[in-house]
Every structure is written in C-alpha cells, then in structure tokens.
C-alpha cells in the first residue's frame, strides 16, 4: 500500500520532469474583443480572435453565454487556429457573451469575455409629417424620430432640395443625442421643407426620413422672451476613465441666447475641455477622477437666463496593480498568492484553476485577492487565474503552480569534482541536489563522517565550509542527500596549494613631469599556479595595449613591474597592483605624485583702469603638486606683436600675490591682460585673456620727429614730419600743432592740422621771400590738451623757377643709337632762380607730345649721353634748368642725324691655326647693305672657358694673331666695327687646349639658325686639323 501511494505521487512528477526544459503553460497572445457586426452582412462570417503560446501547443474551446460550443454538431461554428469563426451570424442565435479557453498538459486559462452584437437601422415610416407653423422670432423644434436600430447614430438635416446639410451656428443646432433640429429664433428664410438624415456607421447604412414642412404664421411677429433650454444633458452621467465625454445644451429664445458653462463647485473648467457648435457642446477628453462633479449650462439673452445642470460620475474598469507569478514548490510546501487591482467601484476577486472556479475548503483559503493552499500535493499543480471584476469589466491574471516530488538527484548539480584552496584559506564545497521535498545533508571525508567543529561547519543550504585550511585537509569529500523518496551520494576532491605572497609591493613615489619610473610588484607563489598581474589606476584597469605610449609591463612570470614613460600630470593618483590566481586575488597600492609647472591662473579681472595703469586680480590655478613661486602679467594690444611682459607694482609677484597694478601703459589703447604662474619645475600655461578694455585718454607726450620741408611754390612754406602712430595719440581729437617764424624773428605763428594721418603742412603768404629760412617746430594735441613740441628745425620757403635758359646747346651723334647733348652752365643768383640741375628734352619730327623724351641730371653736369635711339633718324633736343619750384625756359632746339645701322652680317669663313701659344685667325671681309654703316674694322672677343672676363682685340684687317697660354679651352667670337656701332657677332668658336689637340682634318659646321655660314679650318704645319 505504501509503494502504491509513492507511485501515485511520483508518476505526474516523472511526466513533468521528462520535458522540464520545454513544458510551458498556455499564455494568450490574442484575446477576443467586443464586436458589433452589421446585420445586413449576415451572410458573411464574423471572427472572434484567440491565440496562445505554450508547450505542448494549446487546444481551444469556446463558451457562449457560459455554455460550451459544440463544434461537431453544426457547420455554423468552426475553429480557425484558436479563433472562433461564425458563419452567417444570426441575431437571435448568436448574440451574446463569448469566452475562449486554451488548454495543454499544464492546465487551462480563460480569456476576457467579448460581446457579439448586431448593428442595424430600419427605414423610416413613409407617412407624411404634419406641417409646423411658427411666428417670425419664435423658436421651434423639428423632431427626427429615428426608426428602430442598434449602434451609434449620427444625424444631419437637409433643407428643401439643397444637397448640403443645414449649417449649424448659434441659431441652429442638431442634437446627436435625439437627432432633432432646433432653431432658436425663426427667420423668414427658414421657411421650407426639412428632412432628417441618419447614418449608422457600424451597420454601414443610412436612411432618410419624410420631409417636415415649416411655415410662417401670418398673425404677427413673436416678441422677445427669455431663453428656454430644449437640449439638456442627463442629471447623472456615468463616465469611464480615459473616455471622451460630450455634454449638449441648446436653448430657444429671442434674441438668440448665448451658451456658457461652469462647474458648480467653483473650480475652473479643465484646460483640456473643447467647445464646438457655438459652445452648445462641451467635450472633456481623457476623462479622469478629478473631472467628475456637477456641471452647469447657462443660456442667456437680454430677457433673462435659464440653467441646466447634471452630475458626471467617474468609473474605471479594473486594472492590475499586482499580478500572480509562476511558482514551483515542493510537495508539502505552502502556497501564498496575492493579486491586487484598482478600479471604481472597487473590484471583487474570484480564483480559478484550469478554467474552473476554485472554492475554499480545508487546505484552500480564499480572501479577496489572496489564495493560500497548505500542504501541497501533486494534484494541486495546474494553471490558476485571479479574476478582478467590477460591474464594468472582468480581467484575469494567470500563473502556473507546479508541485514537485522526487528523490535526491545530483545529475544537474553535482559536487565540484576538484576544489582548489591555499594553505590558511577558507573554502565552501557546495552540495545542492535536486530533491523534493528538500533532502537532509551529511558529509564524509574518505570514510570518516564529518561533524561540526571550530573549523568545520555544515551550512544551512547543505554546503560544507572549512576554515584555516592545512595540508592535511586535502582528500575526497562525499555529500550524502536523503529524503523520504531515497538517498543519493556525490564525491569531489579538495586540493591544497601554497599561498601567494607579494614580496616587493609598489611604494609611494614623488616624480617630475617627463620622467620615467618603474613601480615594482613581485610575488612568490605555488609553482603549479598561474599568476596574472593586473594594474589599476584610480580604480580603472590600465589597458597596456592602448596605453603603450606611457605604460609597459616588464618582468618575468613572478614579476609584474609597471614602467611609466614620460610621466604626465594626469598620471598622479593611486596605482593598484592586483595579483590574480585561480584561488585568490591579492593587491598592493601606492600613491604617485607627479609635479609639474602650474596650471593657468583663473578668473583674471580688471578691477580698475586709468590712462597708464590697471588694477588686476586673479586666482591661482592648480599648483600641480609644486607650490607657485611667482606670477607674471602679460599684455596684448592691437599694435603689439603677440604678448609682452609688463612692469607691475609690486615689481615681483610672489606665489601668494593675487592682485597687482600694471604700470607704463599707453593712454587710449585697448589692452588684454593675462597672468602666467611659475614654480620650481617651470613656467605654466597662461590664463585666459581678460576682457578687452581701453585705457583712459591723456595729453599726448610724444612729439613728431624728422621735421623737414622746403620746396613748394613761390610764397609757400612747406613743412613735413613723421606722423605719430595711433598707439601714441593718447586720445580722441588728435592733431598736430605747427609753429614757425622767420629766422631772427621773436614771434611764432601757430597753425593746427586736425587730420591724424597728416604729415605735411603748407603755409602760403605773398610776402614770403623765396628761399627764406624759417625756424619750425611741430607739436601734438588731442581732446585732453596740447602735448610736446619737437626741437627747432630750419626749413626754407619755396623758390622761383629758374629764369634763364642754357646757352651753347649742341648735339653729336656717336652711333646709330646714341647721341650726346652738351650745353653751357647757367650762372644763377636769387633773382634768376636757383639751379639744381638740368632737364634734357629730345624728340623726332613725328614725335607726339606724349612721346617726348625727358632726362634729368643734377648739379653742374653740362653733357648727357642719350641711348636707345633709332638709326639714321633726325633727332631734336633742347635743355632747361630746374629747381624745387619747377623748370625754367628751354634753350633753342638743335638737331642731329643718328648714324646708319651697324652691319647685320657677322664675319664668315673664319679659319684658325694654332702653333704652340700662337693662334692665327682670318675671315672674309663683311660687305654692308646700302642702309648700313661701312665696316671700319673688327673686334675679336676671347676668354677662357671657365672665366667670365672677356679680352678684346681691335683690328682694321681681316686677320689677327693672338698670343695666349692654352692651358684651358678658349671661346672666341668676331664682330664688325662701324660708325653705327658694333655689328653682329659670329658664333662662338671653341679652341681646345694644346694637350687635347690632334690632327683631325677639316670639319664643316651646318648653317646656324641665323643663316650664318661658318667654316672652321684648323692648320697644323702642312696638315689640316678638323675642329674638336
């Protein structure tokens, strides 16, 4: 009997465990929703969706109004997967509440309930409607009277034969609750036939009623009267959470009433409310608890007002706050599940197991959302649902309860085969077999049963913990697990290793930026254990691959030293060497302090600024681990090249000084300031520049220099100077003061020049005698006052142009392109005008005025060569004197004809003979053209190949003899000499040095690109030597 009881308990467990990794309860992925189906489409099919996941795959059932649907009895229903398909649905048979059930081996779950309804609208009755008679100014209601229907309707009205709907405004309103047309005040244009038009979107159908005639009575006009509210919203409206609530209110009256809204509790209407149709409709979207309360509509005109009010009551379907979760428990354990939902009104709870209602009994306690099952057995396994329900909706939370019963089993969680530990360490050997109910645990070392002692503890979860390990603790350890269904054993080995010790830890270091250091980290360890070194900097692992520019691990198997190259300020901090083995992790830490030049000072402020000084303050930046010893202030202006150090008070700014006065500034100049700090390591980066500020204006102190002048016209005194640069003008309104007086006079004349860029002043007075000496000084001024004056300089007044023309002018032609002009010097005095030099003018018969040549010579020069002339051309020339005032009268013109052009043909058929150091040359006589000058002789030009100096030999013959030392090659050319100048040269002839000369006969050169035929013949004794 006991064996049979065990089998009953174990059989479900075996089946469940066989696929424990795969089995899963049904979980809905699709649930049915309410459907309103068009009645006119009854010959088609309606689908109620349902789908669920689970393993094995769930199968499905459906309930209609709580009764199972029999799919085998009728073609009317069929399953499409888990969804219910109803063929040709019928309003009498199929209307109602539907629910889907999904089932597999683990249990059954119920879906939400879905309502199936049928939308329709019948036709209006065809009988004629009665005529409605009203006076002008009276209000009227035209009834729509919708036919039988189901589903939401929308209403509109047409007028006479107009296809467009009646437009609604503050005088006309169509209620979407009743369908009636309300006209607040009838006008003559309202007379006609009105037709109600109804659309049922869910039924996909529209119907049109019979026309209602509206006529105007002839017994007078309706007088004014107070509003009469015809469209009212209900006194109580149930409004769902998150829904959109619409309240209608419309009144008849003369004049046409205005509509307004308010809350009776005095609170303002929510900002989200929307008004439409001249405020006849108030819409509250996304309705919430705070929106409920009493609302009032006020219709008013000049004759009075009327009110309509109603209460909006908030309700909310249930929503889960706490759901139940899948739970696996051992046999005989207790289950406690709690679910909780919100809603208004508060929901009540029911519990289901595998789709059936669960009722309280001896082991089962149900109280609101709490389910307690004591002393679980395998039959309690299944899928449970907590249902939360109020009068508006029911919702379900699903979970699986799996009750397990089995003997101890180590197959999924065996004792670790090998456990390693170091001498002196602690170890926990786990023992966690699968056993339901939980197994009792005991341990053996070898064959010895272990009992708890000072070093050996049996933990609550069955694990074995041993403290302060010694070598003798090594061996095999067996865990024995027992419950009422059986016993199981599992064994593992404990291996004891020597401890790892850091023998050389890193130590604190103090270094300077740019140095390289080594942080030691060396260990002793069990030879069989692999050691891994990991370095941390300020808590972060140092990536030695990415940090290759600075960090490098050096050393062997037991050495993990860290080298830091070119150390920087940001390398200051804590360095942690971690030694990791499979058994333990050791670490040692050291602080590295990196010292460097200070960081940039901060918050540089200009406290005050005058014309030449500025008060500065600043805060010290980081000292980078070395105290700041000195500060330096630098300035920059638009006129300076970069930043310049400036003088300060105090003169030396030590590391504790944070304000100073900058002196020696220029007035009215824009300055930027910055501060630089220094310490024993070096000078740091400068601070950010201060704001750009201008010093105050001041009287200028720098006087102009390089005072000169003179020249100009008669009766003028011209004074020049070097202008003062902007940075020395010291303020706005800058200009120059010009002071002058004749030499010997005691009275100064004073003039002002307001242009800051001026460097010249001309004073004109007819009484000024030419070339009179004046004492001159130039000063400066600005809006602040007059500044310094220069030293006195003598400047002469302007002079007259020369009054006399040169005499004895003559012309002589030297060549085809050159002539010489000569004249007699003028003896001048103050009355005839000073002569500084002479100007030669020359031209041809056909020269235009713009083509007249001009050449000046200074001093007492009385001849001038003019070159670049045309050959065989008549040239005219005249000469005139000049001075600073201008030029005087010209001499009478003279003329001369330039020589004919020199010969254009170069000497030809040049032959040469070299004997020792004597070179004999001969050539043909050059015949000239008719327009060329006759040949008067020849020039031989010769030079050594590697020298630039050329020697010239002139001859009247067509041959020449040269005595030259031929230690180098010589280059020779020959040209004609004539009255017109030198003619064209022959091509260069290369005469080799004696040591390289050999007899080679005669060589003829091809004609040149200038069509010059040259034949070079080399004679040596009686043989002919060819050209090299």
Curated annotation (Swiss-Prot):
Its main location: membrane. Residues 1-19 form the signal peptide. Changing residue 585 to C: In a breast cancer sample; somatic mutation. Residues 26-117, 122-208, 227-308, 318-402, 408-495, 499-587 form the Ig-like C2-type domain. It is a lipid-anchor; GPI-anchor. Residues 600-698, 703-800, 805-901, 902-996 form the Fibronectin type-III domain. GO terms for cellular component: axon; parallel fiber to Purkinje cell synapse; plasma membrane; presynaptic membrane; side of membrane; synapse. Keywords: Cell adhesion, Cell membrane, Disulfide bond, Glycoprotein, GPI-anchor, Immunoglobulin domain, Lipoprotein, Membrane, Notch signaling pathway, Phosphoprotein, Repeat, Signal. One of its GO terms (molecular function) is cell-cell adhesion mediator activity. It is found in: Cell membrane. Residues 1000-1028 form a propeptide. Residues 887-902 have a biased composition (Polar residues). Disulfide bonds join 50-100, 144-196, 249-297, 339-386, 431-479, 521-577. Residues 887-908 are annotated as: Disordered. The keyword Kinase does not apply. The modification Phosphotyrosine is found at residue 882. Glycans are attached at residues 65, 193, 368, 377, 468, 659, 765, 860, 865, 895, 931, 956-957. InterPro entries: FN3_dom (IPR003961), FN3_sf (IPR036116), Ig-like_dom (IPR007110), Ig-like_dom_sf (IPR036179), Ig-like_fold (IPR013783), Ig_I-set (IPR013098), Ig_sub (IPR003599), Ig_sub2 (IPR003598). A lipid is attached at residue 999 (GPI-anchor amidated serine). GO terms for biological process: axon guidance; cell adhesion; central nervous system development; dendrite self-avoidance; homophilic cell adhesion via plasma membrane adhesion molecules; Notch signaling pathway; positive regulation of Notch signaling pathway; synapse organization. Interacts with PTPRG. Belongs to the immunoglobulin superfamily. Contactin family. PANTHER family: CONTACTIN 6, PROTEIN SIDEKICK. This is Contactin-6. It comes from Homo sapiens. The lineage of its organism: Eukaryota, Metazoa, Chordata, Craniata, Vertebrata. The gene is CNTN6.
